[in-house]
Every structure is written in structure tokens, then in C-alpha cells.
């Protein structure tokens, strides 16, 4: 209900938090191309009372890391930092939560400076709708703000919008999703992310998780 959203925890999860391990598909696995990828993502609700249009102000932070644990010294070869701040509006139908809309200002960076710096900012508009308790559709579009001569082609990799859907089993123990990220250009060049998760117990919030990207 709306009261539950208003009184919910100030600190919680945002995107999926996961650890995965594996090599790229189509190449022979080696210690150089087999790594751990993990993501940590949190959200901090900054307002208890509702703002105009029934929104709440949130602070977001997501960090993604590629960790070559099979190499000597186990280097972390690619780090991605993604802080943001924005408004979130929960959506209700007959006092039942059915989704949300969001407006965010985000920064994304590899945390380096000089010629190795890869960073950009964006204003993003997102939303998710629960079509029924087992099926959710979602999407996000962003206006990029790119600085630096080394970042001009970043939209060819990070894209300009994304959409997808997620399906849950009736008992909530199995879930699968697909996300399509449209890269820059007029052709049908999409990054595809497939995910599947199996919940060991309905009393647990831990999942066996697999991702193809």
C-alpha cells in the first residue's frame, strides 16, 4: 500500500547484487579470459514525506567489478562506478503496488583520470510495470552528457535506451529476464543480457544466479 511505501526502510537494495564466475562464450577458457564479475547496488531514501506528484528523493550507488582471480596477483581489471540521485514515484491501482517511475541524474566512471578516464553523465527516465504478479516489463531512456575526447564513442557500447521483461514462477522460486540495450546507430544493434535465478527456499533471499551478456 501507499502507507507501506511511505514507511519503508530508508536504506535498501537497488539493482541486483550478485557474484558470477565464468569465461566468454565462443572462446577457449583460459586464466586470462575467465573471471569473476560482481555487482553491489544500494538505494538510500532521503525523504520520508512525499514530495510533489507523490514522489520520493533517493540516493543511488552501483559498483560493478571484473576480477581476474586466476591471474597472478588477481587484478581487478575493470571497475565501474555509478552514483546517482533522483525522484521515484510508486504507482498504485486500487491501493495495490503495480510499478514505479523514476527521474535520475547519474554519473558513470571507471574511476581513473587522464587518458585512461572513461566517464559520462546522463539524465535518465525509467519505469517498470507489473502486468501481473508473475510478469514485469521495464524500460529506461537517457539523455547523455559526454565530456572528454576519449569518451566520444561511449554510446556505441553503453547505448541510448534499454527495455526488457522479467518472469517469475508462481511460487517465486524461479525467475528469468531479458534486457535489450540499444547501441548508438540506426541499425538493430542491441546488447542482449539474459539472466536466470533459482531461489533455494521461500524463506531465503539467496538465489543461484546465471547471466549471459
Residue ranges, per PLM feature:
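Short, small-residue-biased leader/transition segments that mark boundaries at the very start
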Residues: 2-5
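Residues that define the transmembrane beta-barrel architecture of outer-membrane proteins
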Residues: 34-40, 55, 77-83, 99, ...
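Residues on the lipid-exposed face of transmembrane beta-strands in outer-membrane beta-barrel proteins
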Residues: 40-44, 83-89, 105, 125-131, ...
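Short loop/turn motifs that connect adjacent beta-strands in outer-membrane beta-barrel proteins
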Residues: 47-57, 91-100, 131-136, 168-176, ...
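Membrane-embedded beta-strand positions of outer-membrane beta-barrel proteins
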Residues: 57-61, 85, 101-105, 137-141, ...
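Sequence/structural signature of outer-membrane beta-barrel proteins
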Residues: 64-72, 90-92, 104-114, 142-150, ...
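Detector for outer-membrane/organellar transmembrane beta-barrel domains
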Residues: 109-183
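Accessory, usually C-terminal, subdomains that scaffold auxiliary metal cofactors
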Residues: 159-213
Amino acid at each position: 500500500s501507499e502507507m507501506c511505501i511511505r514507511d519503508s526502510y530508508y536504506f535498501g537494495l537497488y539493482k541486483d547484487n550478485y557474484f558470477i564466475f565464468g569465461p566468454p562464450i565462443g572462446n577457449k577458457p583460459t586464466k586470462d579470459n575467465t573471471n569473476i564479475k560482481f555487482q553491489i547496488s544500494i538505494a538510500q531514501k532521503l525523504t520520508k514525506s512525499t514530495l510533489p506528484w507523490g514522489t520520493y528523493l533517493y540516493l543511488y550507488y552501483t559498483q560493478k567489478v571484473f576480477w581476474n582471480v586466476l591471474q597472478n596477483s588477481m587484478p581487478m581489471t575493470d571497475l565501474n562506478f555509478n552514483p546517482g540521485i533522483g525522484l521515484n514515484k510508486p504507482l498504485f491501482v486500487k491501493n495495490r503496488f503495480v510499478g514505479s517511475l523514476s527521474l535520475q541524474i547519474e554519473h558513470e566512471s571507471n574511476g581513473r583520470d587522464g587518458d585512461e578516464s572513461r566517464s559520462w553523465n546522463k539524465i535518465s527516465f525509467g519505469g517498470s510495470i507489473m502486468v501481473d504478479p508473475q510478469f514485469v516489463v521495464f524500460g529506461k531512456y537517457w539523455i547523455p552528457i559526454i565530456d572528454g575526447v576519449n569518451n566520444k564513442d561511449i554510446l556505441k557500447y553503453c547505448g541510448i535506451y534499454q527495455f526488457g521483461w522479467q518472469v517469475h514462477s508462481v511460487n517465486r522460486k524461479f525467475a528469468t529476464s531479458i534486457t535489450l540495450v540499444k547501441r548508438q546507430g540506426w541499425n538493430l544493434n542491441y546488447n542482449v543480457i539474459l539472466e536466470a535465478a533459482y531461489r533455494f527456499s521461500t524463506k531465503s533471499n539467496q538465489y543461484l544466479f546465471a547471466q549471459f551478456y
